[in-house]
């Protein structure tokens, strides 16, 4: 089922071999301010890519604020947390552990008649139950300029630093 006119609060997810409950909320306290969030409690009845055991459990949540500041200027702040059971190898044993990921995003978007500019800062921190952790940070900027009806120039620039793939970040 896909809602053609629905506004998806949870992004970039694929439900596969999963059971759970997802609750979302969207609140407009003022005309130029939107608050939204979700809470997703889930379990995988069969083994998955990251967990070789049945019944791996997890919880994910997100809070986001979006504010319109003046004509064409928008600010956004987002916090996401996810805790999920995964397996790892220790000597000759396969063990389960909880992996917790925190992600923060701050972004600013300015739109004008002939173009736009967006600046974004992301940070991630991952902690595993066995005591290891990793962190990552990314800064990015993108822009576009419409010179005419047929010609538009676009540019993107980004830099990121991560300890490993556990703290990976996406634009």
Describe the residue ranges of each PLM region:
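Exposed, low-structure sequence patches enriched in small/polar residues
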Residues: 1-171
């Amino acid at each position: 089922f896909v809602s053609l006119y629905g506004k998806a609060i949870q992004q970039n997810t694929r439900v596969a071999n999963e059971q759970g409950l997802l609750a979302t909320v969207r609140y407009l306290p003022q005309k130029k301010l939107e608050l939204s969030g979700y809470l997703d409690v889930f379990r995988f009845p069969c083994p998955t890519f990251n967990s070789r055991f049945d019944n791996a459990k997890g919880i994910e949540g997100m809070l986001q604020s979006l504010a319109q500041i003046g004509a064409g200027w928008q600010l956004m702040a987002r916090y996401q947390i996810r805790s999920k059971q995964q397996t790892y190898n220790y000597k000759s044993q396969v063990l389960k552990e909880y992996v917790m990921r925190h992600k923060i995003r701050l972004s600013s978007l300015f739109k004008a008649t002939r173009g736009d500019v967006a600046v974004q800062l992301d940070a991630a921190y991952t902690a595993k139950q066995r005591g290891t952790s990793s962190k990552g940070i990314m800064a990015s900027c993108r822009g576009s300029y419409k010179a005419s009806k047929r010609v538009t120039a676009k540019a993107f620039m980004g830099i990121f630093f991560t300890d490993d793939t556990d703290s990976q970040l996406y634009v």
